[in-house]
Regions:
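Glycine-rich, proline-tolerant flexible connector loops at the mouths of alpha/beta enzymes
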Residues: 1, 18-40, 203-217
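Short, small-residue-enriched loops and turns at beta-alpha junctions
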Residues: 25-38, 66-67, 85-86, 108-111, ...
Length: 225
């Protein structure tokens, strides 16, 4: 709630729209002992409270078809994780909730392969967004091919650039994903320059103690620029 409150103040001052994203369950972690959540219902109630308190839309990930209806009761947008972006049963279940569906492009896919987002439309839901989150570059790095943003926009869907996840350095021997947060501003500016419809940035008051993804987060004090 503290972070949401601060970001709301920043975005209101800058007169830009803001959507709050939070995971109620971190299902895809590098190690068995990694933090996965505070409990599904408790976390989803926090997301609902963010919406009710600050009046901003909220987003959360779902990982299986049976999660779709549950999560849809609490948030405005359901997000399909990159590693699950082609799972037909997951896409159809999400579509049937009637919520806006944000599909993250798999690191292993070309932008043009994201045409399978039509599965959501064919299931009766035209409210679709796509997210660019980088492409696998060797074993332990990602790069952003900015051509992919207009390519995916050509399908008729808004395209978001996930800045911080695009700067992850996966598959580290430590078992913890690394990152390059010093490049967040550069990647964000480039995404805006090529016409991304929005940018996603993970932020925290102290990334070093964040429960997940701290290595690629932007320190909250730096968010306003």
């Amino acid at each position: 709630m503290r972070i949401a409150e601060r970001v709301v103040k920043i975005t209101e001052a800058l007169q830009i729209p803001y959507v709050f994203k939070g995971s109620y369950r971190k299902a895809n972690r590098s190690r068995l002992d990694s933090f996965t959540g505070i409990g599904d219902e408790k976390a989803l109630k926090v997301l609902r409270k963010v919406h009710e308190t600050f009046g901003v839309p909220t987003v959360t990930d779902i990982h299986s078809a049976d999660e779709a209806a549950m999560a849809a009761e609490y948030v405005d947008v359901l997000q399909i994780p990159a590693f699950l972006c082609r799972q037909t049963d997951l896409l159809v279940a999400a579509a049937k909730t009637g919520k806006t569906i944000n599909i993250k492009k798999g690191q292993f896919l070309s932008p043009l392969a994201m045409q399978f987002a039509d599965k959501v439309v064919e299931a009766g839901n035209k409210n679709v967004m796509l997210t660019e989150r980088g492409t696998t570059f060797g074993y332990q790095d990602l790069v952003v091919d900015y051509r992919g943003i207009p390519e995916m926009q050509s399908f008729g869907y808004p395209v978001i650039l996930d800045v911080t996840h695009s700067l992850q350095q996966p598959n580290q021997t430590s078992g913890v994903t690394g990152g390059m947060p010093q490049l967040i501003e550069t990647v964000a500016k480039a995404g805006i320059a090529v016409g991304a419809d929005g940018i996603f940035i993970e932020t925290h008051e102290n990334p070093a103690v964040a429960k997940s993804d701290g290595a690629n987060m932007l320190k909250l004090d730096l968010l306003e620029g």
